[in-house]
Amino acid sequence: MADANPTQMKLVCAAAPSLLFRSMSGLEEVSRLFELRVVAVSDDPKISADAVLGKPAAVSIEVADGQQRWFHGIVAAFGIDGVDGRRFSYRLVLRPWLWLLTRSADVRIFQEKSVPDIVKQVFGDYASNFVSELKGSYQPRGW
């Protein structure tokens, strides 16, 4: 009989390193932006939403053969959920950085730029680690 190992899950949030993973639920669909709802605990009663909101965080889940699946995102919502004994419970919502583009209502006109240049400029406002792997040549567009 195979050994039964519980799934290992971990929360990594540099903005609040004292947060420990407790539970998670999420929604992930093809061609849609994911949303993870994470409950975490900490001995620190004063984790500030200002310190955490908009900052990167990740959850790792141990899957088959000890491999890990990582969910990387930004903290889109954060709040205290209550007290459990002497630990404080917090709720976080993680979303991909691309979600930030849905929060903007900015209108811009790009003249004499290629489509990849436009994408780099728009994405560059939100993600410093965006990498373009396009190889072709793209003509600038008038409007």
Question: Where do the protein language model's features map onto the residues?
Answer:
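Juxtamembrane "anchor/assembly" segments of surface/extracellular structural proteins
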Residues: M1-P56, S60-W70, F78-I80, F88-L101, ...
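N-terminal export/assembly leaders
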Residues: E35, K120-W143
